[in-house]
Amino acid sequence: MAELSYEEELRYNRQIILKAVDFDGQEKLKDSRMLIVGLGGLGCATSQYLAAAGVGHLTLLDFDTVSLSNLQRQVLHTDSRLNMPKVESAKIALQQINPHVEIETINAQLSEEKLAEIIPHFDVILDCTDNVDIRNALDRRCEQAKIPLVSGAAIRLEGQISVFTYEPNTPTYRQLSQLFGQNVLSCVEAGVLAPIVGIVGSIQALEAIKVRLKIGSNLCGRLLLIDGLTMRVREMKLPV
């Protein structure tokens, strides 16, 4: 396992003093490889907290470019990087947040076959997309490789998060999509208030760290539903 430098020990001190993390946990984070699919609002929030927390390797996957309408909620991107690939814009910002993190980018829309090739090389996959087909492809390939998937969604003032570990007798994303159907609106059609993507993305980062360090109780088998308009949070048990 990779050892922490003195500078890293200082940087991550407030995490290391947590009994659930300690030096072993921080070193495990440094050894970790995570794939973030989608560098929009959720991906920006998720990736900055994973980078700041000291996840040693992040691969960013997206095929889109930065547009002006993104800047209201996609906090890693800036006016000076309009029309730049989102993965490259995010990489610049994340390297400024934490230069100790290795960041790779994939500026492409990968086929399901290509996803099947790369997913086994990661410890956790984070689904930060707003595309049902991509979500289902990630679910199938993560299930095949038995790699945990942390899925989040945000629209209007509402958010939802769940974790899929693919252990025996646990649900998959298919069960979730069957509950809500395939005709899911995007924020382009329905709108989204900026802070809700930050809330959901931050929880995704938290769940990814918990899954990787095997601490606490993650959202496997449960769907966390957040209503930002009323500030009510509820939980739904997912069918197996």
Residue ranges, per PLM feature:
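Adenine nucleotide-associated cytosolic modules
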Residues: 1-240
